[in-house]
Curated annotation (Swiss-Prot):
This protein's record includes keyword Iron: yes
Organism (species): Arabidopsis thaliana (Mouse-ear cress)
Positions of the catalytic residues: K265
Site (described: Important for catalytic activity): D284
Keywords recorded for this protein, A-Z: 4Fe-4S, Chloroplast, DNA damage, DNA repair, Glycosidase, Hydrolase, Iron, Iron-sulfur, Lyase, Metal-binding, Plastid, Transit peptide
Task performed by this protein: Bifunctional DNA N-glycosylase with associated apurinic/apyrimidinic (AP) lyase function that catalyzes the first step in base excision repair (BER), the primary repair pathway for the repair of oxidative DNA damage. The DNA N-glycosylase activity releases the damaged DNA base from DNA by cleaving the N-glycosidic bond, leaving an AP site. The AP lyase activity cleaves the phosphodiester bond 3' to the AP site by a beta-elimination. Primarily recognizes and repairs oxidative base damage of pyrimidines.
InterPro entries: DNA_glycosylase, Endonuclease-III-like_CS2, Endonuclease3_FeS-loop_motif, Endouclease-III_FeS-bd_BS, HhH-GPD_domain, HhH_base_excis_C, HhH_motif, NTH1
GO cellular component, one term: nucleus
Name recorded for this polypeptide: Endonuclease III homolog 1, chloroplastic
Disruption phenotype: No effect on chloroplastic glycosylase-lyase/endonuclease activity, probably due to function redundancy.
Upper lineage: Eukaryota, Viridiplantae, Streptophyta, Embryophyta, Tracheophyta
Length: 379
């Protein structure tokens, strides 16, 4: 007795019937082999593994099952990636995000442009050029020197370096400190006159300032900018110098910056003049304005103008030779007082205007601009 399994149901048949069944099965296998020749090309393109072949030909309905498996094998999941990459797929990076180095300095040729890719390229360009001197800076600097030598500016005779120049070293350093404190938001002529009045009243030493009434100091330094606040600062600074520095002034940048009313510009200027210590460039409003007009400085990673004198100082120190750090301040301050003025600069009198990207862009007076706007409104 033989059990025949068909579609999950077991059936018993006679031995003779089983013999005829085996013969019929063999004939069907021969017929299936002939008919399967139609699929030779399909087998060549997508060969099955040995295990799949056994599954395909070991049961009824073999042709249908073979065709179904071959159709599934055609679906290759990585094929679409090759259409966009332009080269073979790097399989060990498929499951993770690309490294940052892949985007930092490389640009795919023929890739569609976008605003994000444009910003990245600008940033990379700015980073590459950071720390390198601007084009023609030597020629521009020499031209400014020649213009400055032909005409004196207020800073040449009334700058902070002239404060207390006739005093002993310790007293002179304190006078330089006071001159720097009073100089902010104040013209050199006004500042120099205030220092002269303090000297006439014996108030250029920390002992004298500490004992003086604050109201008296206010009257003597008026009309410097913020004279009320600066009188208060003078009293506090005098006390600090007496208590911490034995009547002298601080000799380090950090200690100077700890004094009330003293910022980076003043601290570097005081170190230059009082202690002959060069640790940075003194950048005031004139130096800040002129460096931006000349295109000498920009904000980190951009081509935009710097927004503060301190930001200008950091950018300028990245490329300006250190031997120029002291001279650049009075040079550009005088140039800003006489030619490259804050309002309506004299570009027509500037010998380096052809090298200045901002030349003749701020020379129009407000009245002329108003006239032009009125003309445009006329019918």
């Amino acid at each position: 007795m033989i059990l025949l399994v068909n579609g999950g149901a077991a059936t018993s048949i006679h031995p003779n019937a089983a013999r005829f069944y085996r013969i019929g099965t063999m004939s069907r296998q021969i017929h299936g082999a002939v008919s399967s020749s139609k699929h030779i090309s399909l087998k060549t393109q997508h060969p099955l593994s040995d295990s799949n072949s056994e599954l395909a030909y070991g049961a009824s309905g073999s042709e249908t099952r073979v065709y179904t498996r071959k159709k599934r094998l055609k679906q290759e999941p990585f094929e679409p990636l090759e259409k966009y990459s332009g080269k073979g797929v790097n399989t060990h990076k498929l499951c993770g995000l690309p490294d940052i180095e892949d985007f930092a300095y490389k640009k795919t040729i023929g890739s569609p442009s976008s605003s994000r890719s444009t910003e990245t390229s600008i940033t990379v360009t700015s980073v590459k050029t950071a720390g390198y001197p601007p084009e023609n800076w030597v020629e521009v600097l020499e031209g400014i020197r020649q213009m400055r030598s032909s005409e004196d500016a207020p800073v040449d005779s009334m700058g902070c370096d002239k404060a207390g120049s006739f005093l002993p070293p310790t007293e002179r350093r304190f006078a330089v400190l006071l001159g720097a404190l009073l100089s902010s938001q104040t013209k050199d002529q006004v500042n120099n006159a205030a220092i002269h009045r303090l000297h006439q009243n014996g108030l250029l030493t920390p002992e004298a300032v500490d004992k003086a009434d604050e109201s008296t100091i206010k009257e003597l330094i008026y009309p410097v900018g913020f004279y009320t606040r600066k009188a208060t600062y003078m009293k506090k600074i005098a006390r600090i110098c007496l208590v911490k520095y034995d009547g002298d002034i601080p000799s380090s940048l950090d200690d100077l910056l700890s004094l009330p009313g003293i910022g980076p510009k003043m601290a570097h200027l005081i170190l230059h003049i009082a202690w002959n210590d060069v640790q940075g460039i003194c950048v005031d409003t004139h130096v800040h304005r002129i460096c931006n007009r000349l295109g000498w400085v920009s904000r980190p990673g951009t081509k935009q103008k710097t927004t503060s004198p301190e930001e200008t100082r950091v950018a300028l120190q990245q490329w300006l030779p250190k031997e120029e750090w002291v001279a650049i301040n009075p040079l550009l301050v005088g140039f800003g007082q006489m030619i490259c003025t804050p309002i309506r600069p004299r570009c027509e009198a500037c010998s380096v205007s052809k090298l200045c990207p901002a030349a003749f862009k701020e020379t129009s007076s407000p009245s002329s601009k108003l006239k032009k706007s009125n003309r445009s409104k006329e019918p």
